[in-house]
C-alpha cells in the first residue's frame, strides 16, 4: 500500500479532488487529493505543461497543489518550532552548525539563530531543495547531534 491508502483506511477521511495551480495562482487542472502529492514530486502528476513540472507547495486550506519549475523548490532558509537543543537550554547568539532536512541528505553548512516565541531560524550557506513543512530538521556539530525541530 501507499501513504494515501493508509490515511484513507485508518483515519477514515475523505480526500477530495482539488486544483493544481501555478506559482502565480493560475489554474492548471484538477488533482486527485492533496495527500497524494509530495513536495518535489515530478512523476505521476497527470498534467502536461510542455516542460518539467514539480510540486513546489501544498496550500492545504485551499486544497491546492502548487506546480512550478525545479528552481522554485530551492530555499536558503527555514524556520522551525518544537526545537530541542541538547547541549544548552537557550541559544544566546547565532551559531554555526550543519543541518539536514532529509535522512539521505548530506549535512549542509548553516547558521542557527533564535527568533523568539519558540521559533528558530536556519540560514543555509547554499540553497536547499524541497524543504518541506512538517518534516524534521536536525542540527549537528561535527558528528554529534545538537538538536532538531519541526520545519514550519
Label for each model-derived stretch:
Residues 1-145, 150-152:
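Nucleotide-activated chemistry modules centered on ATP-dependent adenylation/adenylyltransferase
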